[in-house]
Amino acid sequence: MEPTYTYRSTEATVGRKSPNGSINIFWRGAQAKDVNKFMSDFLNIYKQGGTSLIYSNPFLASSIIHLLFLRIHPYTDGNGRTARILHNIKFTEMINKVYSTRLKLSPLNISESILVNKITYVKRIDNIYFDIKHDSNEEINAWFNFILDMVKEQLYRAMNKLEKIDSSFIIEDVPTSNMRLSRLKHR
């Protein structure tokens, strides 16, 4: 039995309330009447990918999945969190596929960096148009560059955290019957 999904039935906008009380709309999600169709297409793309270069590259494939989900905006709440989770899952799936690994989850989660850079994140999404009349190559490239910057920033954050952890632990050799093991021991 196929699971059933309940998508929003009202229009969705992403925006911010200004100090004077007016709302600055960044972008609108898909029209409520189109959400089921768009999500059906999205799920097919997610599951099957494609034959283009984008779908042979873990970074590009996961970034596109992230973006498409946000632009459809299928739920009344939690779309950003869900998009970032889908990004991580797709990235892990693609790493496993392309590099024949068996990761359970991506070792790198960019949510923290995205939340710190939320204004730029929203602007990058807002700048991308999905219509035949507009060539969004420049904006799509800006999206990819932004996500790449978030990966770099998150790697930097992770390295700083590891250095702090490393300074409070020492590595100690543990003799065993047939081999030597190393373990972390708190200083």
Annotate each predicted stretch with a short phrase.
Residues M1-R187:
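FIC/Doc superfamily catalytic core
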